[in-house]
Amino acid sequence: MSIDSELQATIDALVQDGKGLLAADESGPTIAKRFKTIAVESTEENRRAWRSLLLSTPGLGEFISGVILYEETLGQRADDGTPLPELAERQQIVPGIKVDTGKIPLAHAPGDEITQGLDGLAIRVDRYKQQGARFAKWRAVYNVSDTLPSRLAIEANAESLARYAAICQEAGVVPIVEPEVLIDGDHSIARCAAVTDAVLHAVFDALHRHRVLLAHMLLKPSMVVPGKEHAAQPAPAEVADATVRLLRGVVPAEVPGIFFLSGGQTPEEATANLDAMNRLSGRPWLLSFSYGRALQEPPLAAWKGQAANVRDAQQALLLRARLNGAACRGRYDAAMERAA
């Protein structure tokens, strides 16, 4: 199979109506914080048990087309010895991999950050592909204030995202490009929109320079929302209007799918906002989800680190996946939360 055919086959498998992505690629420190909320120690065995629980959830493939894994998970096995990526594949869920190595302060740019991981990336992507990964993810983050992010941070992160995407496509691995405008702070929805617009323009300029094929990549942006400390929190219809209006002006129609991150929203908020977007007309791309905490928070609370709670946790995950699947079609209703 040619590289182009390989990339297209992965896009076709990921971009499906009513399905989204499960982001299970938390770094060591992040998953330790999540486990702390349920008083569970972040050991290798507990992480393996948790991710095995997620990927073995019966029926998950009806609403989830792909899962983003952390490097550790590629080599882990379920209790019966099945490699965890294979658990996903059994439900036609495509395994993917987070390939960046985290963020550091950007030199000479106080308050801004830059993502690392380009050194040796081509070699790592080839290895991950041999382990079963068919797509990858790289996250850039942008802190927001009256003066942040700087132009330097916007351009430096766009360049890194584009270089990563080009390296992945050369290897036959679909890149997910994730520019996250952070929800931290008290900025307005208008400020978020202005920053997101500048960020996405820079990202697509860089993708063009690096000859990234837009038809063979996916975008994972944040929604246009105010900072979580802002006094006025908008209704889903306002978030949807602001987000889709901005995307129409920036994201080329060749991009096959936009998979939103939840970025600190509650599970219910993330679902309602996605649903509101899918009720709007004039969307050339599929609008879906790539949620981490917004999918995992309810099952994590149900699990509590206890094997006896696995079934309850899996039912909680399946419910959130089902509700987000409905939101992908513009058919979600808050009453569905209460009926569950």
Q: What does each model-identified segment do?
A:
Residues 1-131, 144, 232, 236, ...:
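Alpha/beta catalytic barrel-like cores
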Residues 43, 138, 177, 219, ...:
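Conserved, mostly hydrophobic/aromatic
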Residues 71, 140, 221:
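Residues that line or immediately flank small-molecule/substrate-binding pockets and catalytic motifs
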Residues 94, 174, 216-218, 257:
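Proline-centered loop/turn at the N-terminus of a beta-strand
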